[in-house]
């Protein structure tokens, strides 16, 4: 039997906690026998004293085990259980293509996703732009969809990692969110509760990233890979660029539209293609569905070219109570904004920098995201035809097309877009879509 205050004291004094002590504390968070003050105190001691790798693994496993851990063995699936997690960005719609692409190649993707957070868009919010789409099927239905379709994208239920929910709520109001061991534990507790064989992390870098510097993004990626592998799940991470909007669009229905166009081949943004393909390749190799990069790429390109990936997406939408002909008739179903018109720069020049975070917040301000949990979302608003870094803009080439609910909404967004996009008289050096691959 342990005392919570003695565990806090031990960590406060810079000592290493045992697996048993960590499990006792996390179980107390779940059972409400540990107070909010005690959670806050331990979070602050971890913030200042960090955690060893064994402590990080113990924390993650204890939070994972605080609720249901999905077990797929009795389904006798003929492929690996794999998933991807992104730290979030603007125009980051990769999940909507990646899940169906990997499923079409023989993987099973039980993706448990989140809503928008701050300036970043949420996969669940995007999918809810599809009429009828059910993000909370019951457990049996979720398992049936995975078995039949190969991919389902759902929201987190109360049974998955419940200790994390309470721990995070306390961190959020005590300035202890940005601690790498605590971020790592929070992300992985939920992902590892999916019962995965393999995981790939997409850790963003740049002006629209969760972590403010390259070094911190790199440290987070290394921590997640180390802990997840320590927990027995094959995991790699990619550091990917978020110094510009990833897709050509930002906004819920607009990004769903671009995802369908990507899958059908109607339109594929080159940077979005690079990042999506690279993440899928990691999943196929880690899931032992391909022996190397070249084989994985060939398989993925084949399911795009033969329409199988688009078909899987359509089947997933139908299985989750969306329209059965969504892929064929997406424009019929997705909500459209009242006003769509281009915004132009006041001067000519090359796009040299972009405040991606500000562009994400502009979508939120238009009604495309939440400032508080009770807000309702306008799924139709946002941007399309976004410029890229290095593009030349003038009276012919707009910065973006703004989809707004009215003229005042459009004017406010236009001001934000102009302020967020920096022009220069010469083109900047090109930046990679992917900075680094981390395997250990």
Swiss-Prot record:
Tell me the route in metabolism or biology where this protein functions. Answer: Pyrimidine metabolism; dTMP biosynthesis via salvage pathway; dTMP from thymine: step 1/2
- Keyword Transferase carried by entry: yes
State the Gene Ontology terms under molecular function: 1,4-alpha-oligoglucan phosphorylase activity; thymidine phosphorylase activity
Query: Which reactions fall under this protein's catalytic activity?
Result: thymidine + phosphate = 2-deoxy-alpha-D-ribose 1-phosphate + thymine
EC number annotated for this UniProt entry: 2.4.2.4
Any Gene Ontology biological process: pyrimidine nucleobase metabolic process
The protein's matches in SUPFAM superfamilies, at most eight in alphabetical order, are given as: Nucleoside phosphorylase/phosphoribosyltransferase catalytic domain (SSF52418), Nucleoside phosphorylase/phosphoribosyltransferase N-terminal domain (SSF47648), Pyrimidine nucleoside phosphorylase C-terminal domain (SSF54680)
Query: Carries keyword Transferase?
Result: yes
Its quaternary organisation is:
Homodimer.
Family label: Belongs to the thymidine/pyrimidine-nucleoside phosphorylase family.
Task: Name the job this protein performs.
Answer: The enzymes which catalyze the reversible phosphorolysis of pyrimidine nucleosides are involved in the degradation of these compounds and in their utilization as carbon and energy sources, or in the rescue of pyrimidine bases for nucleotide synthesis.
Protein name per its UniProtKB record: Thymidine phosphorylase
Native organism: Salmonella arizonae (strain ATCC BAA-731 / CDC346-86 / RSK2980)
Q: Which gene encodes it?
A: deoA
């Amino acid at each position: 039997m342990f005392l919570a205050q003695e565990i806090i004291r031990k960590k406060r004094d810079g000592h290493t906690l045992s697996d048993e002590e960590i499990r006792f504390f996390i179980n107390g968070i779940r059972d409400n026998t540990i107070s909010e003050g005690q959670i806050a105190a331990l979070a602050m001691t971890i913030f200042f004293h960090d955690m060893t790798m064994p402590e990080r693994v113990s924390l993650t496993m204890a939070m994972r085990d605080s609720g249901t851990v999905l077990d797929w063995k009795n389904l006798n699936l003929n492929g690996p259980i794999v998933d991807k997690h992104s730290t979030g960005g603007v125009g980051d719609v990769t999940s909507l293509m990646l899940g169906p692409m990997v499923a079409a190649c023989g993987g099973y993707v039980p993706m448990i996703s989140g809503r928008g957070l701050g300036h970043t868009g949420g996969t669940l919010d995007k999918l809810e732009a599809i009429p009828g789409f059910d993000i909370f099927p019951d457990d049996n239905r979720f398992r049936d969809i995975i078995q039949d379709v190969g991919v389902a994208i759902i929201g987190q239920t109360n049974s998955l990692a419940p200790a994390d929910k309470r721990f995070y709520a306390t961190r959020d109001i005590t300035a202890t969110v940005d601690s790498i061991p605590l971020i790592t534990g929070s992300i992985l507790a939920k992902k590892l509760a999916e019962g995965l064989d393999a995981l790939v992390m997409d850790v963003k870098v740049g002006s629209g990233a969760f972590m403010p510097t390259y070094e911190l993004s790199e440290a987070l990626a290394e921590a997640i890979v180390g802990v997840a592998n320590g927990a027995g799940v094959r995991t790699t991470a990619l550091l990917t660029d978020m110094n510009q909007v990833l897709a050509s669009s930002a906004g819920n229905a607009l990004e769903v539209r671009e995802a369908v166009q990507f899958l059908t081949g109607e339109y594929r943004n080159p940077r979005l293609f690079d990042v999506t393909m690279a993440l899928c390749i990691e999943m196929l190799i880690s899931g032992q569905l391909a022996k190397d990069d070249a084989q994985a790429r060939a398989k993925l390109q084949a399911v795009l070219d033969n329409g199988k990936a688009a078909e899987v997406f359509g089947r997933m939408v139908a299985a989750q109570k969306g329209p059965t002909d969504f892929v064929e008739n997406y424009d019929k179903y997705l909500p459209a904004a009242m006003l769509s018109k281009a915004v132009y720069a006041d001067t000519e020049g090359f796009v040299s920098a972009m405040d991606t975070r500000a562009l994400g917040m502009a979508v939120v301000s238009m009604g495309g995201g939440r400032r508080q949990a009770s807000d309702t979302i306008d799924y139709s608003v946002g941007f399309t035809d976004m410029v890229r870094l290095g593009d030349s803009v003038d009276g012919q080439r707009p910065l973006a097309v703004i989809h707004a609910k009215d003229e005042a909404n459009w004017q406010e967004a236009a001001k934000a877009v102009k302020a967020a996009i920096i022009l220069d008289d010469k083109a900047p050096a090109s930046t990679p879509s992917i900075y680094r691959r981390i395997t250990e």
